[in-house]
């Protein structure tokens, strides 16, 4: 009886720990946002991102949230733009989001991990 209870608890814990969306590895760069493809104005201090053109064009991603994880930490960004030069697994984020998750802007382009939230 006790071993069955432990199995049920472990199964539930594992299911809760699994991310709802798969994680994606991609190249992370930064840009200076303005009026993006989603028609809103944003600045360097906003936690925003542009996703690759192919991904952006495949659905309605404006205002969706992404959790970006890098060497410096994690940040939640909002999709506000389309990145013409990005592959579908890459992100172009505001300078503030880049610094919070990836590190100094001088790094330029780094690999990061992200998923939809």
Label every model-predicted segment.
Residues 2-117:
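Secreted/periplasmic proteins
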């Amino acid at each position: 009886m006790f071993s069955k209870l432990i199995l049920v608890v472990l199964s539930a814990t594992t299911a809760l720990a699994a991310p709802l969306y798969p994680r994606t590895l991609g190249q992370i760069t930064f840009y200076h946002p303005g009026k993006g493809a989603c028609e809103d104005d944003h600045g360097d201090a906003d936690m925003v991102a542009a996703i690759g053109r192919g991904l952006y064009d495949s659905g309605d991603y404006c205002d969706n949230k992404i959790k970006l994880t890098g060497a410096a930490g994690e940040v939640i960004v909002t999709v506000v733009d389309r990145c013409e030069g990005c592959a579908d697994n890459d992100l172009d984020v505001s300078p503030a989001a880049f610094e919070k998750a990836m590190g100094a802007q001088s790094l330029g382009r780094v690999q990061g991990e992200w998923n939809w939230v």
